[in-house]
Amino acid sequence: MKKIVVAYSGGLDTSVLLSWLKNKYQCEIVAYCADVGQEEELDGLEVKATTTGASKCFIGDLREEFARDYIFPMFQAGAIYEGQYFLGTSIARPCIAKGMVEIALRENADAVAHGATGKGNDQVRFELSAAMLAPKLVVIAPWRMDDFRAEFPGRAEMIAYAEKHNIPVQASAKKPYSMDRNLLHISFEAGMLEDTWFDATAPSARDMYKLSVAPEDAPDQPEYVHLLFENGLCTALKADGTDALLDQFSLKPLAVKDGFTYLSPYGIMKVLNALGGRNGCGRVDMVENRFVGMKSRGVYETPGGSILFAAHRQVESITMDREVMHLRDSLIPKYAALVYNGFWFSPERDALQALVTESQKHVTGEVRLKLYKGNIMAAGRRSAFSLYDEAIATMEKDPTQSYNQNDATGFISLNALRLKASARRASAAL
């Protein structure tokens, strides 16, 4: 082993891991940190990495790529895992893995290393992504190595190691939960949350949340947001206070037209996160089925993603053909499972994405949503490609006479044939 690229955050765990790998393999270590919107302080990270033992440190700004190439295609597919989870952590891992693999190939490294534990899903996501992108790279997972776990059975041993080896980390008191943040969401798990009866909405847990206010603390007046979609992808939005948010996040509009602000996918997510967060939207508490076989409780904040999901569904409702929608809906659990289980880079996900792209070619229009104390309510939808015909749908007299109610008699009779046959068979068996 001559060179290893290590996924690095600058925290205690990855700093110790970096130093330990250098000592174990006696080779060059390159640190890699991906910025996927985790809002961590990255200044000084290169110095910290080289002081710890890395020959160099790369920081990849993947925020726009993450939104454009991962979040938006996934929401275009309507993916949601087990009916609740918007896959915030799951979708970030292939993006990070791709960035790390690209650095490894550029640096002619022999291996990549990550700090994911042997009990979680992330180890699978990182390694399956690497297998598809660069099958010749060796993947090192220290937490699955007996000697690493023996040396570091707990946090105290890591702190002692850092002090002994002059690793520049500031060890803080461990929080009663673990947290993972990116542009799409924040996840909380472990610690106090391992008790499935623990109330994550209780006042004692109030300080845990970072992206959203508690619904009961949200404004007493509803807030409206309009979103424009083109081919199933959100391109623009309109809401009170948008300009202030653009200034706050240093975002430059691509265009401003008819009151709508056109933004890049990254900009869309930043603004929607702020809008949803201040209205208490996007909190989920669930017990999910991990790919590695166990059940795990997670608490998630996905304010912007929740708005995007709801709006996309509304514009689909008037623009998608019924059978195309039902076909796509039947594939959502499979698509979501592929993302959750680490198969973003796979031929089957590519095939599903092609179907999604075809299904979305007329999903273009405007949606109006009402945000109020944690609720996201549809308040209108319209499209030049709408399949909704008010003249046909009306309960009043149809001026077009394109729907003859008498035709329903034959339709019902034909659909009842198999039911009557089943009933006759059941009666004969008595």
Could you describe each region identified by the protein language model?
Residues 1-7, 12-430:
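Nucleotide-activated chemistry modules centered on ATP-dependent adenylation/adenylyltransferase
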